[in-house]
Amino acid sequence: MVVAYKHEPFTDFSVEANKLAFEEGLKKVESYLGQDYPLIIGGEKITTEDKIVSVNPANKEEVIGSVSKASRELAEKAMQVADETFQTWRKSKPEMRADILFRAAAIVRRRKHEFSAILVKEAGKPWNEADADTAEAIDFMEYYGRQMLKLKDGIPVESRPIEYNRFSYIPLGVGVIISPWNFPFAIMAGMTTAALVSGNTVLLKPASTTPVVAAKFMEVLEEAGLPAGVVNFIPGSGSEVGDYLVDHPRTRFISFTGSRDVGIRIYERAAKVHPGQIWLKRVIAEMGGKDTIVVDKEADLELAAKSIVASAFGFSGQKCSACSRAVIHEEVYDQVLNRAVELTKELTVGNPAEKGTNMGPVNDQAAFDKVMSYVAIGKEEGKIVAGGEGDDSKGWFIQPTIVADVAEDARLMKEEIFGPVVAFCKAKDFDHALAIANNTEYGLTGAVISNNRAHIEKAREDFHVGNLYFNRGCTGAIVGYQPFGGFNMSGTDSKAGGPDYLALHMQAKTTSEML
């Protein structure tokens, strides 16, 4: 019997042995920087002249690796392979599929610091953020494997004396996985393994700025015994390969994590029925947020300031769950703001490969330019009291930025920034604070810092987000503990790491036999 699920513990880097082990992981990754990685279609490794070049966002001159780039023709080949492989994979035993996930999790656990080091180099994650990303990848595999074992025999339904009824789940078909750059291991691995353990075959198109960690994960799946053709690795451009596969009549479902605009585009394209298509495509989408921490006047103000700073600036604010707005009761606004500024000025920004770094770079030049444009907007809409500077000479570094005294209807309070910028806004009372928090087209995460039980219960009912936290920050959902997904334009509320997530990758079948 499989042991009960528990989340992978985070590494304590204050322990010297762990620090040394992580440094060894960095050395290992540095030893193979710049390598070429092929496409993988039906187990065949295919090298193309056209490449996706992955660079270190902390050092633009350092190439992490070059990954072959799929064309439409190769995407079509991958679709044919995945479609054919599905005919056998869908009949494979769920226990066997789960065992592959458990083996893959064990392999990653043994190579944990190596994978985290890839994330340091390719995604610009500081040690603790990279370690958490890798731990979450392990968690997804361990959790989804166990969930499949629970679902393999279906769910009991009622029968009558003269009949026997069964309710079971069967796989959907070929799934297109379009994974993000901000959690390029955890979310990519979670989306991929959820699809395959449910009996589907996969076309994996990772984010173009972080394809190397996905290529390394393909090695893990092969070592874990995954048959060729179940997961096909096809990095490529969204406009060429992504659109082609979303439109393809043999695509059964699309699992996407990324921006609102791209998510909407995928949703619209997937709704169109193409010639030869005999189903309605399913879309599983997580699309971002404009997340708020509300601070009540009856609250632990030190906890409030620490929660805001950690949630706003962890991984440079590049989390869909990051705190982008701090809405604070006017009676305690100045105290919380001043303390948050103090804490922010203590943060170190620099090379994430160095242990003491709190914040690394943003993802790429486009991200840098976008965030700095919002810093400029912040100068007009409020007062910059911390940060406000950026330097893209070597890498894409932006100082953690607090914009104070922002009006509730300002752009900084409405638009997703996806960087280390947080707007502070005053609220007249708790009801006003909740109204400001809900005044957005998103609904992903939120937090309330309060010692008032009535206010906590009011927020539990009225704060319209998919993941709501009390007296803590608004980031850091744990697989199996806080299933993750949001409302409104944050996506389809597909709760990753939750008990109903695998069912999104399957269809229910009822059989009834007369006795």
Curated annotation (Swiss-Prot):
One of its GO terms (molecular function) is 1-pyrroline-5-carboxylate dehydrogenase activity. The keyword Thylakoid does not apply. It comes from Bacillus cytotoxicus (strain DSM 22905 / CIP 110041 / 391-98 / NVH 391-98). Its EC number is 1.2.1.88. The lineage of its organism: Bacteria, Bacillati, Bacillota, Bacilli, Bacillales. The active site is at E286, C320. This is 1-pyrroline-5-carboxylate dehydrogenase. It catalyses: L-glutamate 5-semialdehyde + NAD(+) + H2O = L-glutamate + NADH + 2 H(+). Belongs to the aldehyde dehydrogenase family. RocA subfamily. The gene is rocA. GO terms for cellular component: cytoplasmic side of plasma membrane. NCBIfam families: D1pyr5carbox2 (TIGR01237), PRK03137.1 (NF002852). Gene3D superfamilies: Aldehyde Dehydrogenase, Chain A, domain 1, Aldehyde Dehydrogenase, Chain A, domain 2. It comes from the Bacteria.
